[in-house]
Curated annotation (Swiss-Prot):
GO MF terms, alphabetically ordered: small ribosomal subunit rRNA binding; structural constituent of ribosome
Domain of life: Bacteria
Family matches, as PROSITE patterns: RIBOSOMAL_S18
Name of the coding gene: rpsR
Gene3D superfamilies: Ribosomal protein S18
Protein name: Small ribosomal subunit protein bS18
Pfam families reported in the protein's UniProt record: Ribosomal_S18
UniProt keyword terms in alphabetical order: Ribonucleoprotein, Ribosomal protein, RNA-binding, rRNA-binding
Lineage: Bacteria, Bacillati, Actinomycetota, Actinomycetes, Bifidobacteriales
Function field: Binds as a heterodimer with protein bS6 to the central domain of the 16S rRNA, where it helps stabilize the platform of the 30S subunit.
GO biological process: translation
Length: 82
């Protein structure tokens, strides 16, 4: 006979607050560089929605806006430095 080990209590999942709703942003624009920089890591990568706390649709719009801003030379593709 084997005995089951008691399981530790599971903490309830706490959802991150949406930063776009907190800032009352209705439209994501590639020209709003200050907003887009919040969703880019210090290495220049686009942060995942698991980290940022945005919805799927908002993440798609953010990534498109960041890519457009990079193409228009408003944002760098990568950081300069070591």
């Amino acid at each position: 006979m084997s005995r089951k080990r008691p399981q530790p209590p599971v903490k309830p999942f706490k959802k991150k607050p949406n930063p776009l709703k907190a800032a009352k942003v209705t439209e994501i624009d590639y020209k709003d560089v200050a907003l887009l920089r919040k969703f880019i890591s210090d290495r220049g990568k686009i942060r995942s929605r698991r980290i940022t706390g945005v919805t799927v649709q908002e993440q798609r719009e953010i990534s498109k806006a960041i890519k457009n801003a990079r193409e228009m030379a408003l944002l760098p593709y990568a950081t300069s430095g070591r």
